[in-house]
Amino acid sequence: MTSDPGSALQHRKRRHIDVCLTEAVDYQSLTTGFERYRLPYNALTQTDLHSVDLSTEFLGSHLRAPVLIGAMTGGAALSGIINRNLAAAAQQLGIGMMLGSQRVMIDDEAAAASFEVRGVAPDILLIGNIGLAQLRSSMVPGLAAALDRVGANGLAVHTNPLQEAMQHDGDTDFSGSIGRLCDVAGAIGYPVVLKEVGHGIGAAAAAELVGCPIAAIDVAGAGGTSWARIEQFVRYGDVRYPALAEWGVPTAQALTEVRQMLPDVPLVASGGIRTGMDAAKALAMGARVVAVARPLLAPAVESVEAVVDWLQRFIDELLVCLHGCGAANLSALRGRGVTELP
């Protein structure tokens, strides 16, 4: 008798949730690098705090604040509760959301319900998700149908070679994946965001994307949640390869390198973005929006209100950061820049 691959995938998705809620899954020594930068403080700011404008446009959608709920989960029964609570919070706050990988939804019809959030979030920017390792041009019709089914506005393609290498039976053949990415991005009919999962996109990877018809890049740098660490907990029950769990391009470095290599491509900064100050620094360094994922997991298990509370504090801190450096809007913030400490 053969095992059901869909059921196995759903089980792994639930294990990911459990590990993220109960184990130490952040990088233990590697940091995002944002501590090396300071946002300029202006004691003579000429802004009115209550008039500071955080709104922006991303992938053709208007956001009340430059914040996305990052990709987390899908497929398990609990995933549906988490995703609906996250989406409802995004609807209340006027921000966007990335879904977890829809591979399980494509493989198993029963998993589709965990991704369907439009009932509670009819107006949000909603970004679907698929893995680069699994991406094939032949998938375009089925993938487009999956995006249509959930009412997505775009597609995130996540590249995760280190995570896959740590995963039991991971998809470790990435040969030809850049060409497939560019082919699908040109054919799918949705704006495509290339993203990492928390080990970072740096200069070498960005150089490979020149001319590729992607709409944005989520640098998803190192310093927050380590998926190489998570997969080792899932596979072994502990961290058997600690050096690999601490490997990646720190978020601030990733943001700087990709911005320099691809100056016209909109960037998402994620990976260890934990505070409004982190977000302000990332935006001042050239990100169009920021994304936050794992800090919202426990609140999302609890309630919509818990997610809204966490995000509102995050957004309020970001608002004060703009006010304190004399920036009335996000364009002005980018003009302020940051100071790198010696």
UniProtKB/Swiss-Prot annotation:
Q: Where does Mg(2+) bind?
A: E164
User: According to the lineage, what is the superkingdom?
Assistant: Bacteria
Q: Which GO biological process categories is it annotated with?
A: isoprenoid biosynthetic process
According to its UniProt record, the EC number is: 5.3.3.2
Q: Which UniProt keywords apply?
A: Cytoplasm, Flavoprotein, FMN, Isomerase, Isoprene biosynthesis, Magnesium, Metal-binding, NADP
Residues annotated as coiled-coil are: none
Q: Per the record, a Pfam family?
A: FMN_dh
Required cofactor names: FMN; NADPH; Mg(2+)
Chain residues that bind substrate = R12, K13, S101, Q102, R103, Q163
As its record notes, the protein acts as a catalyst of: isopentenyl diphosphate = dimethylallyl diphosphate
Under the heading Gene3D superfamilies, the entry gives: Aldolase class I (3.20.20.70)
Record text on subunit structure and interactions: Homooctamer. Dimer of tetramers.
> Which PANTHER family is this protein grouped with?
ISOPENTENYL-DIPHOSPHATE DELTA-ISOMERASE
This one is known as Isopentenyl-diphosphate delta-isomerase
- The organism is Mycolicibacterium vanbaalenii (strain DSM 7251 / JCM 13017 / BCRC 16820 / KCTC 9966 / NRRL B-24157 / PYR-1) (Mycobacterium vanbaalenii)
